[in-house]
Amino acid sequence: APKNNFGYVSIDDEKSRKIVELFEAVEDENIGFLKEIFSKDLKFTDPNGTELNKDEFIAGVENIFDMFDDVEFEDSEYSDYDGLAVETTYYTNGQVWTNIWSRFEGKGKYTGNEVSFPFHISYLWEGDKIIEEVQFFSTKVFDAENEAKNNQLK
């Protein structure tokens, strides 16, 4: 890839492929892959700016598994990968960030709603582990499903 003062972007490197695998693991509800790829020192920031540690993040993913069936990530016209547009930027300052643009699709177990919404997530790498995740999307779907779940559990 051509280099400049900024860095360079790759769509077919190891880290981009790992993020594709990460989303396949979410579709398969394979929490073990997530526990492995995320650093023990993970700093996770949700779309509302709330910061969580790794244990809190994993619990949140397990809650998504509980709230939704048939989770899939929609094909993107911008990508060679099925379902995902993923790119990794290798900055000249040494930071490596992988970004994904996709759609979350699934069926709410508590509302019965078929849901679909676009999202963007950025991942900062430290070696072969993800040390930071920052999410950008509307949480309305998750909030509604969580509310329905809590109401049913009362």
Residue ranges, per PLM feature:
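Low-complexity, intrinsically disordered terminal/linker segments enriched in charged
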Residues: 131-154
